[in-house]
Amino acid sequence: MQLEKQLQHAQCTFPFSHLGLLKTDNAFTITAWVPNATGIKVIDLATDKAIGSLKRQAQSDLFTAEFTKGNPPAVYAFEVKNAQGSYRIIDPYQFQDQAFHAVHFVDHLPKNVYQQLGAQLIDLDVGLKTPIAATRFAVFAPNASAVSVIGDFNYWDGSCLPMQKTDFGYWVLVVPGVKAGDKYKYQIKDAHGNELPHKADPVGFYAEQYPSHASVVFDHEQYQWQDTKWQQQVKGDKYTQAMSIYEVHLGSWKRPDSQSGKTYLSYHELVDELIPYVKDMGYTHLELLPISEFPFDGSWGYQPVGLFAPTSRFGGPDDFKYFVDQCHQNGIGVIIDWVPAHFPEDGHGLARFDGTHVYEYEDPRKGWHPDWNSCIYDFGKDTVRQFLVANALFWLDKYHVDGLRVDAVASMLYLDYSREADEWVPNVDGGNHNYEAISLLQWMNKEVYSHYPNAMTIAEESTSFAKVSRPVFEGGLGFGFKWNMGWMHDSLHYISKDPSYRRYHHGEMTFSMVYAYDESFVLPISHDEVVHGKGSLLRKMPGDEWQQAANLRCYAAFMYAHPGKKLNFMGNEIGQSAEWNHDSSINWHLLDYDKHSGIQALYRDLNTLYAEYPALHELDHDPAGFEWIDHENAEQSTLAMLRQSKGGKQQVYALSNFTPVPRTNFRLGVKAPGEYSILLNTDDKQYWGSGHSQNKTIKADKTPWNNQAYSISVSLPPLATVFILYKGQ
């Protein structure tokens, strides 16, 4: 195909071989492709004088001229005439070296992916008084026959700015004058010349919402962070610190007034409303359902397309930085859900990016997820591995987030996950472990903890895969923490039973301690447990209205007593009646009722108690911090445990009664003589409890009980958990 037709039909693979300034022995040639131009002059920008005119080639939009006198200009512009008048543009095709710079080091370090690819704002220092502001575009499309950058700056015309293909499958171009805020996409032709749906930038930093889904050029260097004090505070051992996580879907935590005409609160409005609430409630961390840009609201963010762009539903990238910054200035850590397991088929996204399987496994037995109707990343492909690890580092680097909760880890680890016998491909050893995904997760964790030792990674992993939260050098996956899905499943199953039947399920509340120290666990009552017909946490509880609330309070306090960091989804803390709906707000009006405000008050006090008493958090992941005092009283459905700090310096007993029967003069074995005091009783009237009488201070006597030399007699309220502090002799 002739060059003119290649350019006209956006089918030019190597424009640098034809356009721009090309030197010969004793001359230089300048060639331009400017659709709809009627004339072009070449302006030497060093002198701002014309050095000649380009001649149209055979009534085409291709213009060229050979210059046999003088030296080539260091940098030049075109004075273009067309039917509407004239304008000046700086020729993109003279900056070939600067364009190639994007891919010189991209494979060396994961961070280079977001520092070199995508739309990078650069200053071209070409000897002028002021550098030329430009944007360097670089995108990976190894099997495309042609790629053009299209956007506001060229009227979305794919014939205007063909990109240059490099030896490594990247396409590059520097475009002067493209600035922050300009919208763009890539027009890609597959290997056969067929035009694909216009693609958003895989490394785009900002994205528009439906219907355009366009990428937006963004400058990451403008925001001035104010969280230095926080960065100093977070140094330390995460395993011995209190961690109470409030899991939030930003789009439905609270909605604007219906008369505002807005669908969502903005990041700035969430700063004003969400942060004070979280701080007042005593949570240490926010965990946000996926922030990466996603097209479908109903996916809650778990079908992301723009991995490097915070969703613009609530504002721009700097607005999200401000949100994180303000969280830190208020002493709140920020964890984001991160989704490296799969991605959706949306036409503007990664699926068949250049007409081939660039990002996903080609074989559908590995590359298609039957549960979510989505594509699975090719975890064995170097460019994909770099892309994903880079994205993990990106959020820690550019947005200062404190941790990543990695979604759907089990689906990555197992080749036969949710597949029938004939629907999966064994690994090289004939097994079902995905070695490529395993090594990717190990690499990601090593990179995160190497560059950001104060950060944390948390795995949502629902199987018994070994050493998920153990270091890679010990043969583990390298995560900092793992969700304890077993505890969640067993304890919710138990608490949903009528109290009269709980005696037959007693082991469901104690079995978790058999494996409690195999991993570094987070106890999660997450969004997954209050959707899809499962009902709200309150509605899982049996009994009448009072018993449901009492069961929830008893269960919540048992969770805070149990070893492991804590996570609760929004709405749990007010005893929301309806299950979560992403299209509407939490039912905040329920706080007008004592039942719900009482539950909220309990969660607030549990967070305070958990943070203030080292016995309840310091040894969450050390067997020395826990002892069953009585875990065998199935007949009365009671449980008693001891939590203690390092060296036993502080001792807190937790006693739970999972029946509606009050237990007067209930005897509890204790370690030492002396005085004990009630720290918290979930049956107190302030929590909408019955206010069952209870002495605040109790003396131990030398009555052996529960294999202890001493014991105390307490009044154990119905459906309640009581925390008791040993004060000393």
Swiss-Prot record:
GO terms for molecular function: 1,4-alpha-glucan branching enzyme activity; cation binding; hydrolase activity, hydrolyzing O-glycosyl compounds. Pathway: Glycan biosynthesis; glycogen biosynthesis. Pfam families: Alpha-amylase, Alpha-amylase_C, CBM_48, GlgB_N. Keywords: Carbohydrate metabolism, Glycogen biosynthesis, Glycogen metabolism, Glycosyltransferase, Transferase. CDD domains: AmyAc_Glg_BE (cd11322), E_set_GBE_prok_N (cd02855). One of its GO terms (cellular component) is cytosol. It catalyses: Transfers a segment of a (1->4)-alpha-D-glucan chain to a primary hydroxy group in a similar glucan chain. Its EC number is 2.4.1.18. PANTHER family: 1,4-ALPHA-GLUCAN-BRANCHING ENZYME (PTHR43651:SF3). It comes from Pseudoalteromonas atlantica (strain T6c / ATCC BAA-1087). It is an enzyme of class 2 (transferase). The active site is at residues 407, 460. NCBIfam families: branching_enzym, PRK05402.1, PRK12313.1. Catalyzes the formation of the alpha-1,6-glucosidic linkages in glycogen by scission of a 1,4-alpha-linked oligosaccharide from growing alpha-1,4-glucan chains and the subsequent attachment of the oligosaccharide to the alpha-1,6 position. GO terms for biological process: glycogen biosynthetic process. The keyword Glycosyltransferase applies. This is 1,4-alpha-glucan branching enzyme GlgB. Monomer. SMART domains: Aamy.
